[in-house]
A protein has these predicted regions:
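Extracellular/periplasmic periplasmic-binding protein-like sensory domains
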Residues: 202, 221-235, 253-257, 271-338, ...
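Bacterial signal peptide processing site
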Residues: 21-24
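Periplasmic-binding protein-like
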Residues: 110-121, 139-142, 179-185, 231-241, ...
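Segments of small-molecule ligand-sensing domains
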Residues: 323-388
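Structural motif
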Residues: 88-108, 164-167, 215-225, 240-244
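Extracytoplasmic ligand/sensor domains, especially the bilobed periplasmic-binding protein
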Residues: 114-208
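Signal peptide-proximal N-terminal region
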Residues: 43-44, 70-91
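Extracytoplasmic "Venus flytrap"
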Residues: 35-71
Length: 391
């Protein structure tokens, strides 16, 4: 009996050691600022699609967005063509014409498709075309969640700024933030959304304002920090007692954090004004605008101590596989690049569940959904110090 128990214990120890030895090591290397890597998997070309159809709604308002998405796809296409010889037939189809959409559905049904519905409302599609679209095999890249995608053959890569906001506010909450001021601008206009998310986390919004171009940053912050009220009270008291009172404003003690949802230029203007108005000890969190492209530099002194949530590709991180031309440094390029990567991963039977450290962030594939988390960084002495992906 003792021998049997001993054998069982040894067997369990063996299984434990085996599981530890096969536990994959994270491919990212924070010491080298490497947060973007290729999946650690050997692709079997025979299992990958021989034809990939990329359909999109060509935006008249912002054609550059569609162009950047397609550039990202083709960049990754040529990477795998050169590295492993995988070069499927790549077709690009504009579905702006609903008649053309219906005519091509039969062809699309027989192959793998990438649907770029990121910059246009999918409701622009004819209902018949839309319903057939939901029966395709492939990947939909969307800005707004698609309803009716229950077919396991059609997966959705949902790119949502709201997720970035939620993750960053979660970090603020863990850092002890409770009472906050929210500032958005004309490129975001989402202070109401941020307030709703923060309230759901049991946080309190003391004030929420929009930074408009006609109002200077110093005047805006002086108002929300109640510095003008302090001056008015001092003048009134001086008149009552007949003695000149020196006004020494103190920072508001009823707030502990400020959430900026603005363009990068606006954030660079607001943060120094914040310090000038005696609120330098308040924690500042930034979710950069998606409506206005801008690049972080290697010397962001105006954003000192600000915590930023962003795609790693736009946080000046390094990649472990290739240097990507800086002229392609855009959000939509990163989305297109990762979409093509997902095509390969979703068609590899041995890797149903995976973690991919992509250009847009940490992408996790689970049975029910594909999820993405952005990277977080804090500006220290003008340099970005990378923290981690949101929990």
């Amino acid at each position: 009996m003792f021998k049997l128990k001993q054998d069982i214990i040894l067997f369990l120890l063996f299984l434990c050691l085996l599981s530890c030895s096969t536990n994959p090591k994270s491919p990212i290397d924070p010491k080298k600022n490497i947060f973007i890597t290729k999946p650690e998997i050997t692709f079997n070309i025979k299992n990958l699609p021989k034809q990939i159809n990329v359909f999109y709604l060509n935006s008249v308002i912002d054609p550059d967005s569609t162009s950047s998405l397609i550039q990202g796809i083709t960049e990754n296409y040529y990477y795998y063509k050169e590295e492993i010889g995988y070069a499927p037939e790549l077709n690009f189809i504009d579905f702006s014409d609903n008649v053309y959409c219906m005519e091509n559905m039969t062809q699309l049904k027989e192959s793998f498709s990438i649907g770029l519905l990121f910059n246009e409302d999918y409701s622009l599609l004819d209902n018949n075309c839309y319903q057939r679209l939901l029966k395709l095999k492939g990947l939909l890249v969307t800005k707004n969640k698609i309803t009716g995608t229950k077919d396991k053959k059609l997966r959705e890569f949902h790119i949502s700024r709201e997720v970035d906001i939620t993750n960053l506010l979660d970090i603020a909450k863990k850092n002890g933030s409770i009472r906050a001021i929210i500032i958005d601008d004309s490129t975001t206009r989402d202070k109401a959304l941020i307030e709703k998310i923060w309230n759901n986390m049991d946080g309190e919004v003391v004030s929420s304002v929009s930074s408009e171009r006609k109002i200077s940053s110093q005047k805006l912050l002086a108002e929300i920090l109640l510095l003008e009220q302090s001056k008015v009270r001092s003048r009134k008291l001086s008149r009552i007692i007949g003695v000149q009172i020196k006004n020494e404003p103190r920072k508001r003690e009823d707030i502990d954090s400020i959430f900026l949802s603005t363009s990068l230029p606006n954030a660079r203007s607001l943060k120094p004004a914040l310090e000038y108005n005696l609120a330098d000890n308040i924690s500042v969190y930034l979710i950069p605008s998606w409506g206005e492209e801008g690049n972080l530099t290697d010397n962001e002194l105006d954003l000192e101590k600000v915590v930023i949530s962003e795609m790693p590709f736009l946080l000046n991180t390094n990649t472990s596989f290739q240097e990507i031309n800086s002229r392609n440094n855009s959000r939509n390029f990163a989305i297109g690049y990762d979409a093509y990567e997902l095509v390969l991963l979703l068609n590899t039977s041995s890797r149903r569940n995976f973690n991919y450290f992509g250009l847009t962030g940490l992408i996790t594939n689970k049975y029910t959904s594909i999820q993405k988390k952005s990277l977080h960084a804090k500006v220290i002495n003008g340099k970005l110090e990378y923290q981690d992906y949101g929990d």
